A protein has these predicted regions:
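Cationic, low-complexity basic patches in intrinsically disordered or flexible, solvent-exposed regions
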Residues: 4
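Intrinsically disordered or highly flexible coil/loop and linker segments, enriched in small
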Residues: 63-67, 112, 159-162, 203, ...
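A helix-coil-helix interface module used to build multimeric assemblies
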Residues: 18-217, 228-238
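A short, charged helix-loop
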Residues: 236-252
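Intrinsic-disorder-associated, low-complexity terminal segments enriched in Asp/Asn/His/Tyr and depleted
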Residues: 1, 13-15
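Glycine-rich anion/phosphate-binding loop at the beta-strand->alpha-helix junction
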Residues: 193, 244, 252-296
Length: 296
């Protein structure tokens, strides 16, 4: 049909940009995601974080004695925000590697510093560390919103703590309770979730710069086998990126148990939200609790 033809024409027209780089786009994000969360998972956030990581690495290597000048560092910082997507996109068609394409694109802006970009690192240095940073920021945003729900629900529970209502077991009439007491059950689940969320956030650690197999072999070569110097790399990078520590041991990638922890705590929050909303839906059927509907 005509709509499909128009879409194909747009895709063919290289002068038309159909994606926005300052937000994450999916069929669900426009309806359900906040602008803050969309930005956290956006291309802009991702690639600007890559560049921050490259700057942190270069600064660390300079401070530990490699032949890197402050002029080179300043040049990297001057172009940290202006992501040249067009250059990276064209380069990726040639090399078929996203990280190397962006190393090249960053180097186009940094004539004097292009030789020190990504020095000694692997793709996972930017890829995995950025994933950790993005997940941590996203979890902190979830925490803010979870605290808001807990606060509002606690007010609701206190307001209706003495309002009697029928309690149920197996959704069969049982004994009297109060509306506030019922709300406190939803509230308690969310408090459990907050405790678990705080634990996950507190234990988020950067990967660091571990090299191809987690042995930092490339840095052993760069620093001529100086183990004491190499031991300082991860801690210095972590501090520059706002973290207390890096994972003490890993391969090239961070342990995917980290992803499992994140998914698990998000699942727990979703389970609590489901219990909360499902109870309201059932009570709405009984005309005991109703959600508001606006005129339009």
């Amino acid at each position: 049909n005509r709509q499909q033809e128009i879409f194909v024409e747009i895709l063919k027209d290289k002068d038309k940009e159909i994606f926005m780089n300052d937000r994450y786009q999916s069929p669900l994000s426009e309806r359900y995601a906040s602008k803050e969360m969309q930005y956290i998972f956006s291309p802009d956030k991702k690639f600007k974080t890559w560049r921050k990581l490259w700057i942190a690495l270069a600064e660390t290597e300079k401070e530990l004695g490699l032949d890197i000048t402050q002029e080179q560092i300043d040049e990297l910082k001057a172009h940290a925000e202006d992501i040249n997507y067009d250059v990276a996109k064209e380069r990726e068609k040639l090399v078929r590697h996203d990280v190397m394409s962006h190393v090249y694109a960053y180097g186009v802006h940094n004539i004097k510093a292009k030789g020190i970009i990504h020095l000694g690192a692997t793709s996972c240095y930017v890829g995995d560390n950025t994933d950790i940073i993005i997940m941590t920021e996203a979890l902190k945003l979830v925490r803010v919103k979870l605290l808001n729900v807990i606060n509002e629900l606690s007010k609701f529970a206190m307001k209706y703590k003495d309002l009697p209502t029928l309690g149920f077991t197996h959704f069969q009439p049982a004994q009297p309770t109060t509306v506030g007491k019922r709300a406190s059950l939803w509230l308690m689940d969310l408090v459990y979730d907050l405790e678990d969320l705080d634990h996950v956030i507190a234990n988020m650690r950067l990967l660091g710069s571990k090299g191809t197999t987690g042995t930092q072999a490339s840095f052993l070569e760069l620093f001529e086998g100086n183990h004491e110097t190499i031991k300082k790399i991860d801690g210095m990078i972590a501090k520059k990126m706002g973290f207390d520590k890096c994972q003490p041991v890993s391969g090239q990638t961070y342990s995917r148990k980290v992803d499992s922890r994140v998914i698990n705590v998000l699942s727990q929050i979703a389970q609590s939200a489901h219990k909360f909303s499902n109870d309201i839906r059932l009570l709405q059927h009984l005309k005991e609790v109703e959600e508001p509907f606006e005129k339009n």
